[in-house]
């Protein structure tokens, strides 16, 4: 049983990436994180949401991105879910400089960033059926 849950869904517009960061940061705030911890979470969420918009929906603004977050004791689990084109080869996509959009001036898909800032990263994807990225972080909660 979780201590708290939330979910939000928004259209795949790049402007909504900032909304996603703030919404998740507000939810995680109940764990009394440090500034660095909250920035880590915001950065990881930003990377995952940006991937959904740019790579999953190829910048189409008619897709939906869903975020589900859950707090269990001192850990937050955040799932970023899209129904975009999916990832052909997850292992290749997780390489630091790999991108499915070499036409854009970006340096990879951000999975290395997510791994750096979070305690756990799981990616589940099916070509043509979308992607689910799950990130987790533990906090030093003082009782």
Curated annotation (Swiss-Prot):
GO terms for biological process: asexual sporulation; negative regulation of sporulation resulting in formation of a cellular spore; sporulation resulting in formation of a cellular spore. It holds the Pfam family HATPase_c_2. It is an enzyme of class 2 (transferase). SMART domains: HATPase_c. It catalyses: L-seryl-[protein] + ATP = O-phospho-L-seryl-[protein] + ADP + H(+); L-threonyl-[protein] + ATP = O-phospho-L-threonyl-[protein] + ADP + H(+). InterPro entries: Anti-sigma-factor_SerPK (IPR050267), Anti-sigma_F (IPR010194), HATPase_C_sf (IPR036890). Transmembrane segments: none annotated. GO terms for molecular function: ATP binding; protein serine kinase activity; protein serine/threonine kinase activity; sigma factor antagonist activity. Its EC number is 2.7.11.1. Keywords: ATP-binding, Kinase, Nucleotide-binding, Serine/threonine-protein kinase, Sporulation, Transferase. Belongs to the anti-sigma-factor family. Binds to sigma F and blocks its ability to form an RNA polymerase holoenzyme (E-sigma F). Phosphorylates SpoIIAA on a serine residue. This phosphorylation may enable SpoIIAA to act as an anti-anti-sigma factor that counteracts SpoIIAB and thus releases sigma F from inhibition. This is Anti-sigma F factor. It comes from Clostridium beijerinckii (strain ATCC 51743 / NCIMB 8052) (Clostridium acetobutylicum). The gene is spoIIAB.
